[in-house]
Amino acid sequence: MPTITLPRIIYPFPSLINQFVTAAHEQNRQWVADFGFITTPEAMARFDRSRFAWLAARAFPHAGFHELCTIANFNTWLFMLDDQCDEAQLGKKAVYLEHVTDGFMNILKHNTPVDTVLGRSFTDIWERMQALGDTAWQTRFIRSMEEYFTSCHWEAGNRAADIVPTVAEYVTMRPYTGALFADVEAIEIIEKVYLPAHILQHFIVQRLVLACNNIVCWANDIFSCAKEARQGDVHNLVLVLQHERNSTLQEAVNETARMHNEEVKLFTALEKLLPSFGAEMDRELERFMAVLRSWITANYDWSYHDTGRYQVKEVEVVINS
């Protein structure tokens, strides 16, 4: 694996962290043990190094303890699903993966039990989420999860057929494969930010959500490109750029960083163009925007400072200061 220089990423937003982060980590490690995700001391040591609760605590800095645990468990579940796809080669078995995700959709839509570790744990999360969100919120969240699972099927089909997506295809699908739209929907129940549909669906708000998603996902692709290149997974913006343009890995990293930085500029510009929806709604919208900003910094801070998941400090990666 060649040595690559990672670009220095700086955001014009504050880095925050929830006061309940340590307690949420303890709850999260107990949760994965109780549901059977972790069965050995070695696996628990790896889990502790991943520090999943820190990502949730940075992204939702003002959430209460119960809400923080709920979203930390949810994001941990997503990582566990991702790992099981890798370990069981589930990510290459498109038809079987559809069967598995159909079970998860039945949990969401009908509260139908699924007697697996992933199924039982997802039911536990969904029961807590249902208690926090009304039916309108639940409908939005279910749609975001359905889109996420559909994007997983797309990736699995590509892997099974040895297809490398084009850059255009990848950029279109990447906001869904990261499941961040589900986390954005969760802002309402986790940080208690209540915005009516006409504000959430306003075209500037929608583009800000997409910009946040792109920034987070493309930064993640930079951090994880070495790991995914080793695993032979092409679903990474750096790697599809390298393939399509026949460039070096470093050139592809640099282009991904340029695209990422342009999206940050767009985000900050669009914030200034948001219309007023009245004093009360403007305050709620500012709280919503604050969580989007927190997600952007949370992803970077967690990836670089907290977790051992992406190994961004390995010798094959040099951070450019």
UniProtKB/Swiss-Prot annotation:
Instruction: Give the GO terms filed under biological process for this record.
Output: terpenoid biosynthetic process
The feature of type site (Plays a critical role for abstraction of the pyrophosphate group) is located at G178
Q: What's one GO MF term for it?
A: terpene synthase activity
Q: Which parts of the sequence are marked as the site Plays a critical role in the stabilization of intermediate cation?
A: F79
Asked if the record carries the keyword Lyase, the reply is yes
Q: Which InterPro entries match?
A: Isoprenoid_synthase_dom_sf, Terpene_cyclase-like_2
Give the binding site residues for Mg(2+) 1. D82, D86
- Tell me what reaction this enzyme catalyses: (2Z,6E)-farnesyl diphosphate = (-)-gamma-cadinene + diphosphate
Which superkingdom is the protein from? Bacteria
**Which UniProt keywords are listed?**
Lyase, Magnesium, Metal-binding
UniProt-listed Enzyme Commission number(s): 4.2.3.62
**Residue ranges of the motif DDXXD motif:** 82-86
Positions bearing the site annotation: Plays a critical role for substrate recognition: D83, E155
Q: Name a Pfam family for this protein.
A: Terpene_syn_C_2
Q: Please share the entry's free-text remark on the cofactor.
A: Binds 3 Mg(2+) ions per subunit.
The residues listed in the UniProt record as binding Mg(2+) 2, with positions renumbered to this chain, are: D86
Instruction: Please state what class of enzyme this protein is.
Output: lyase
- Provide the binding site for substrate: R174, K227, R309, Y310
Cofactor(s) required, per the database record:
Mg(2+)
The pathway to which it is assigned is: Secondary metabolite biosynthesis; terpenoid biosynthesis
So where does Mg(2+) 3 get bound?
Answer: N220, S224, E228
- PANTHER family under this entry? BETA-PINACENE SYNTHASE-RELATED, TERPENE SYNTHASE
Please report which protein family the annotation says this sequence is part of: Belongs to the terpene synthase family.
Say what the protein does. Catalyzes the conversion of (2Z,6E)-farnesyl diphosphate (FPP) to yield the bicyclic sesquiterpene (1S,6S,7R)-(-)-gamma-cadinene via a 1,10-cyclization, which requires the abstraction of the pyrophosphate from FPP to yield a germacradienyl cation. The only accepted substrate is (2Z,6E)-farnesyl diphosphate (FPP).
**Comment on protein domains:** The Asp-Asp-Xaa-Xaa-Asp (DDXXD) motif is important for the catalytic activity, presumably through binding to Mg(2+).
The identity of this protein, by name, is: (-)-gamma-cadinene synthase ((2Z,6E)-farnesyl diphosphate cyclizing)
The major lineage groups are:
Bacteria, Pseudomonadati, Bacteroidota, Chitinophagia, Chitinophagales
